[in-house]
Amino acid sequence: MANTVILVDQPTLEKMKQTYLPFSNPKLPPGAVFAAKKTGVSITGYKSRKVMFQGVNGEVEAKKWVATLPESKTKAPSVSKGILPANFASKNVIGSDEVGTGDFFGPITVCAAYVDAEMMPLLKELGVKDSKAMKDPEICRIAEKIMPLVPHSVLLCPNPKYNELQKRGMNQGQMKALLHNRAIENVLKKLAPVKPEAILIDQFAEKNTYYRYLAKEPSIIREDVFFATKAEGLHLSVAAASIIARYKFVQAFDAMSKEVGIPLPKGAGPHVDAVAAEIIERFGLETLAKYTKQHFANTEKALKMVKK
């Protein structure tokens, strides 16, 4: 079995843990902080910040993450700050980001937003920055202030549609690529005849993989497109897109909670299993499917809780 080991920083390790939650394996080897299994690859992340990829797709999966490959003494293909044009942070850019991919409940939500140099001082004054450390109330407060100022497009993939696409063989990467491409296209149409100097996508797949996912799309945005991990820190457009996406995600979550009559939790941990089991007991499995990503391990865990 082919093994690939990469060394990552702590924020990347946490991001990987969240990304692989839908494929999580509860049995952790000694020293591990997460373990997951996807088609053709098993992934194990360790406290040492080393992540091991085992299987025929191990190397391909590893290359999605910006990190050193110690075993081969080479570097994974890196799409990061280094390849962006000079003074990128001050350019007029469309940025895009997504939320909801690691949450059992709720839709995948993608936002593309345009920020030009003239707008930047005001956005900074309003609190636009990397939103990962922000709580929902702050996210919502800032989003409501910037949405009238920032040309943007938000697209949601509701859970019933997500489940339908997933059963037809589409993975999350494909869904995200479609949503990013369409959201960016929507913003370009709003801006016309003005053109951005660049487009920056918060990277979730290699460039070639991203465009392969879009192969059947009638319109594919390729001109001046860049991909980078941690893109919120590289341009305010991505930070703004992330804030707006999270705001819309929170709104969708609140609406679903009211509809089902139960406060729905974010994430995909044990606390989520308990709420899912309650929904199954009260309303049935079909109702749960309306609000969740069915292929997550939480579905089976909740069913086992109900059967006890």
UniProtKB/Swiss-Prot annotation:
Name of the protein in question: Ribonuclease HIII
MF terms (GO), sorted A to Z: magnesium ion binding; RNA binding; RNA-DNA hybrid ribonuclease activity
Major location (coarse): cytoplasm
Domain of life: Bacteria
Subcellular localization, as worded in the UniProt entry: Cytoplasm
Cofactors that this protein relies on: Mn(2+); Mg(2+)
Its EC number(s): 3.1.26.4
Cofactor binding description: Manganese or magnesium. Binds 1 divalent metal ion per monomer in the absence of substrate. May bind a second metal ion after substrate binding.
GO cellular component: cytoplasm; ribonuclease H2 complex
Family membership: Belongs to the RNase HII family. RnhC subfamily.
NCBIfam families xref list: rnhC
GO BP terms: DNA replication, removal of RNA primer; mismatch repair
Pfam families per the UniProt record, alphabetical: DUF3378, RNase_HII
